[in-house]
């Protein structure tokens, strides 16, 4: 008598941080966070949940925040690292510090910090005032 038992096989993805690039953080083109790392993606044939045979291996850039990933090679990784390490030109209005003006102070004093405006807080009610009556119609 022949007994047919199905063998559950599937393809499993295994993500490993590439040890050569473990300190590299790049900017994600989708979410603009600096959370992209270089991973080694191994697709393997698995029996139930145990990986048995590796089928495919590649290097990928993967964002841990939004899940975006892109297959790359070593030359592309080095190119992106150089591009992100370039200094960005500063805007003149962003580099100039603006100080708050206080009446009666000298204009030559430059170590005055900016003061944030305080939110409007209404004065407290007197305890003898009753709250407004509610109307039921």
UniProtKB/Swiss-Prot annotation:
Q: Which organism is it from?
A: Schizosaccharomyces pombe (strain 972 / ATCC 24843) (Fission yeast)
Origin organism lineage: Eukaryota, Fungi, Dikarya, Ascomycota, Taphrinomycotina
PANTHER family attached to this UniProt entry: UPF0768 PROTEIN YBL029C-A
Annotated spans, Disordered: 79-137
- The residue ranges flagged as biased composition, category Pro residues, are 119-137
Superkingdom: Eukaryota
Comp. bias intervals (Basic and acidic residues): 79-93
Protein name in the entry: UPF0768 protein C1952.04c
Family indicated by similarity:
Belongs to the UPF0768 family.
**Cysteines paired by S-S bonds:** none
TM annotation in the entry: none
